[in-house]
Amino acid sequence: MVSSTSIPVVKALRSQVSDYGNYDIIVRHYNYTGKLNIGVEKDHGIKLTSVVFILICCLIILENIFVLLTIWKTKKFHRPMYYFIGNLALSDLLAGVAYTANLLLSGATTYKLTPAQWFLREGSMFVALSASVFSLLAIAIERYITMLKMKLHNGSNSSRSFLLISACWVISLILGGLPIMGWNCISSLSSCSTVLPLYHKHYILFCTTVFTLLLLSIVILYCRIYSLVRTRSRRLTFRKNISKASRSSEKSLALLKTVIIVLSVFIACWAPLFILLLLDVGCKAKTCDILYKAEYFLVLAVLNSGTNPIIYTLTNKEMRRAFIRIISCCKCPNGDSAGKFKRPIIPGMEFSRSKSDNSSHPQKDDGDNPETIMSSGNVNSSS
């Protein structure tokens, strides 16, 4: 027998399920936020801006497909760090696909969607973009750990890599699925977002806070990576001659430029959207006109998925060569096992070991044995 206390819960669940299939809810929420009139006046098929955005998304999809093909076809890239780069390419590819679908289902088509379909349309974007940002954080964590240990990760660390990658997707799915699981404003019209009329403002604030913390974490990790490299470079100046010290300083400056590019692009792509979402939380309905231009801010964040393959892949010399071979429809190299394997530590940086690292001699202090060399943004550790 169902208890009296559970009856309200059952009724609420039934009401929520019925609301998810109610077409009128979309119209009601868009009308409340002022987006309904905008849609009626301007939406006559696909807008020119939408066509441009779709073309950009197609380019993003293609370049990330080539990155995945490069990693898949090149055996020497079947290593933990490249799994992270492959995961980033996959999430960026899905971001391009999700935004293309979002654009095709926008405009007048929006009012033909049920709330459940609307949540899937927007939630897929949140999942893909969240996975992309979490992947950037995972890469920063992996490279920071690599710098701390000053040695290549062996196969035993594959489990940690897959654990981090799995965590990226699980957290992203949960984050993107919260609205359809109940954290929405269907029953509270006054709490609705203007940018996303079925999303609760508290959810928007929560997501903005999470992404801001991720951004700060990535900035801190890359600053720490540069600090570690700079510190080890200074140690060498006390043991090497003036010419080597000067050369080390120049290469450290090149590394700093690489870090600045990475962080500047990331902040430039995401900060405008963060600011817009904070305005959305603070503004009442129909009071902030800038909120009706949200697609320009969102496409800027999606553009980050187009810059990631350039920054995180093509700055690696070996990946760049393999990438060009894939594009040229040539066979990918099987990899020279006798050669040095280079692993990126930060974008545009590669990490390698000399053969003497495999000797039976015990490892000495950083200042005694491993010489940290920074050239053109590439970091190598050699004996």
Curated annotation (Swiss-Prot):
Residue numbers binding sphing-4-enine 1-phosphate: R121, E122, F266, I267, A268, C269, W270
Modified residues (Phosphothreonine): T237
UniProt feature, compositional bias: Polar residues: 372-383
Record field: transmembrane: 48-69, 84-105, 118-139, 162-183, 198-225, 259-279, 291-311
Basic and acidic residues: compositionally biased ranges: 352-367
Glycan-linked positions: N31
Gene3D superfamilies: Rhodopsin 7-helix transmembrane proteins (1.20.1070.10)
Location(s), subcellular: Cell membrane; Endosome; Membrane raft
Residues exposed to the Extracellular side: 1-47, 106-117, 184-197, 280-290
UniProt record similarity statement: Belongs to the G-protein coupled receptor 1 family.
Name by which UniProt lists this protein: Sphingosine 1-phosphate receptor 1
Organism field: Rattus norvegicus
Gene name as annotated: S1pr1
